Amino acid sequence: MILSFVFGLLLMTTQQVNTQDHLEITKDGHTVTNINRLDFSFPYTDLPIIDSNKYNQFLDKLDKQFSVEPKNASFDQHGQIIAEQAGYRIHRQSFTEQYYAYYFSQQQSKLEIPMLSVYPKVDSELLGAIRSIRIGRYVTTFNSHNKKRSTNIQLAAEAINNYVVFPGEGFSFNKVVGKRTTAKGYLRAPVIVKGEFSEDIGGGICQVSSTLYNAVDNAGLKIVQRFSHSRKVPYIPPGRDATVSWYGPDFEFKNMYNQPVLIQAKTLGNLLIIKVYSSDSIEYIPRKIPSF
């Protein structure tokens, strides 16, 4: 805001906003849109002063349209590493410099959207290194004939599978799995609400959060937040469950170790298996976890 105001003051004696010319915005040589100086100028003035709020909203819209999220390296179902993929976002500084040159030049022009590479946090080398040793594990069983509940368990397990928690980082089950919706494939299945059985979208995912809790507890990771159900659940020993709800309780832990940890989760028949891995240089203290 201050920068655009200063530019305006410097040029106000020699320049007024030309409303006839335009700037052609292109991507890979194809026209995306055409904009005029008035689109981002303060109204009721002939001075060339940019409205930074409008301009930034325009950049945000372009960024949302053309940005590509990076993809971390991961393991496939056969244990082979799938290489990482770089992402891209608009190079806002370069775009702004070119836009300012147009805005204060009184010339019709064209601007090719500059892109900036965004690299994933987890590459193939790191992923391979942190699967050296297993530091935690837990297995629970479920009724695979209950298709709706089984579907929810599988979807939640896939959401946390291959997730890497770096040293000092926290893990939130709700943030990683996201909101459970029908658009994501979640189905209505039994849940426990205030001690009573009911049905809701995503019923069954608490088995995933509970199995994860025991796996990371077995690995000696720091438990930050955990709540038990209001009644006993059949798939875990008493007091070893971790209930979650999008608008309610969450399960959280933190990696206090000196190395990243890798979560691997999968369903196999009627088994939900969650393992925690890290590099062979990790200094960890495992905990003994009760099982059925």
What is each of the regions a protein language model found here?
Residues 2-3, 7-292:
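Surface-exposed, secretory/extracytoplasmic low-complexity segments enriched in Ser/Thr/Asn/Gly/Pro
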